[in-house]
């Protein structure tokens, strides 16, 4: 079985990547699975692409192997695209999903239902030694619910209702969520690069 490093320490993302890559007969190894401690890579980029590339390229260089990294976030139209690049730490450091959700709900409390459109974005960077870094981008369109619902998933899943559904991502069965998520949509595009790994 082929192996690929996924440059994340986020347990939720690591679990999703492992499930996605298993269908391609590829073992996804997260930074949490490695025997050595990897310091956090500072996300100093000004775009999702730059942040994903920073992580993928640094880890690829360190281990001299193919690495996939993602940078993802929630873009809310009524908040001019916030939390955007700062989705994980929207309420400040250290990162806290509950605090982030509460901040978004507070900022959205007076926004009418028809103005609550939002989308998740996932940008994947594929870095390999001696090769140009490639990118795949996936989206999941939907809107922001007025309150939290559900206990599956992570991040903003309890307040995000995907298009064509009437429940939040956190209320969906994890297998169903993985079929429609922004990460899955990005990974679907990634398939064309997998033969080069």
Curated annotation (Swiss-Prot):
InterPro entries: dITP/XTP_pyrophosphatase, ITPase-like_fam, RdgB/HAM1
Classification via HAMAP family: Non_canon_purine_NTPase
Listed GO CC annotations: cytosol
Gene3D superfamilies: 3.90.950.10
Keywords from the named record: Hydrolase, Magnesium, Metal-binding, Nucleotide metabolism, Nucleotide-binding
Family of this protein: Belongs to the HAM1 NTPase family.
Keyword Transport: no
Cofactor binding description: Binds 1 Mg(2+) ion per subunit.
A biological process from GO: nucleotide metabolic process
Organism: Oceanobacillus iheyensis (strain DSM 14371 / CIP 107618 / JCM 11309 / KCTC 3954 / HTE831)
Pfam families xrefs: Ham1p_like
Record's protein name: dITP/XTP pyrophosphatase
Subunit and partners: Homodimer.
Superkingdom: Bacteria
Enzyme Commission code: 3.6.1.66
Reaction equations catalysed: XTP + H2O = XMP + diphosphate + H(+); dITP + H2O = dIMP + diphosphate + H(+); ITP + H2O = IMP + diphosphate + H(+)
GO molecular function, one term: nucleotide binding
Residues given in the record as Mg(2+) binding sites: 42, 71
Cofactor(s) the protein needs: Mg(2+)
Active site: 71
Purpose of the protein: Pyrophosphatase that catalyzes the hydrolysis of nucleoside triphosphates to their monophosphate derivatives, with a high preference for the non-canonical purine nucleotides XTP (xanthosine triphosphate), dITP (deoxyinosine triphosphate) and ITP. Seems to function as a house-cleaning enzyme that removes non-canonical purine nucleotides from the nucleotide pool, thus preventing their incorporation into DNA/RNA and avoiding chromosomal lesions.
SUPFAM superfamilies listed in its UniProt record: ITPase-like
Binding site residues for substrate: 8-13, 72, 154-157, 177, 182-183
